[in-house]
Design a protein with these regions (language model features):
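N-terminal glycine/serine-rich phosphate-binding loop of ATP-dependent small-molecule kinases
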Residues: 1-51, 98-99, 159, 172-178
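Conserved donor sugar-nucleotide recognition element shared by glycan-biosynthetic enzymes
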Residues: 7-10, 14, 62, 81, ...
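Surface-exposed, flexible loop/turn segments at secondary-structure boundaries
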Residues: 39, 48, 62, 110, ...
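Carbohydrate-associated surface elements
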Residues: 59
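Pocket-flanking alpha-helical
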Residues: 64-68
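Gly/Ser/Thr-rich active-site cleft segment
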Residues: 72-183
Length: 184
């Protein structure tokens, strides 16, 4: 099963909806983001453009990668973000020399809504990446090394509630005051 996410289309839909709601209802105190967890998007830090289509959580193209890693002692399921992000990096930057950002859909939306000011995700989204230690307190260097994922490409992990930035891409630049992955 192949399930791709066009990052630009997702952002345009969010911006169109946000602008329409704000035009109809007027200013808001804050906005929040909710999304399907475990989908992966990779974008260029300088241009803010996706380097290709993202991969949806249900995509199974990295099953063989998961089996290979499992034989090496790194156990990951194909519905996690980890191997999807590595696959996208392999396609866009096999030598890992570009300055790219990796994120789930919430990270991509926050990046775009804040004009590139914030590269973050929340604890509900990071929990389904496969890139954190079992206690979810830090990035799992063993997994990052196995997948050749640079730590600098990863988002900062923030609380699910609290102001994390201004949505300057929307009229009135409302604060983004919450991120929450689905099924919470």
């Amino acid at each position: 099963l192949v399930a791709q996410v066009e990052g630009g289309d997702v952002v345009e839909a969010v911006l169109d909806l946000g602008r329409a709601v704000l035009a109809e209802g007027g200013p808001v105190d804050a906005v929040g983001i909710t999304n399907q967890r475990a989908s992966a998007v990779v974008w260029d830090r300088a241009t803010g453009e996706p380097v290709g289509p993202g991969i949806g959580w249900q995509d199974l193209r990295t099953v063989i990668d998961c089996l290979t890693l499992g034989a090496q002692g790194v156990r990951l399921a194909p519905n996690l973000t980890a191997t999807k992000a590595a696959h996208l990096l392999d396609l866009a930057d096999p030598d890992r020399t570009r300055d790219l950002c990796i994120g789930t859909v919430d990270s991509w939306l926050v990046w775009t809504l804040t004009g590139g000011a914030r590269h973050v995700t929340d604890v509900t989204n990071v929990g389904l990446t496969g890139l954190r230690t079992a206690d979810q307190l830090e990035w799992d260097q063993r997994v990052l090394d196995a997948l050749r994922i640079p730590t600098a490409a990863l988002p900062e992990v923030v609380d699910s509630s609290g102001v994390i930035g201004e949505a300057t891409a929307l009229p009135g630049a409302p604060p983004i005051a919450g991120i929450l992955g689905d099924q919470q």
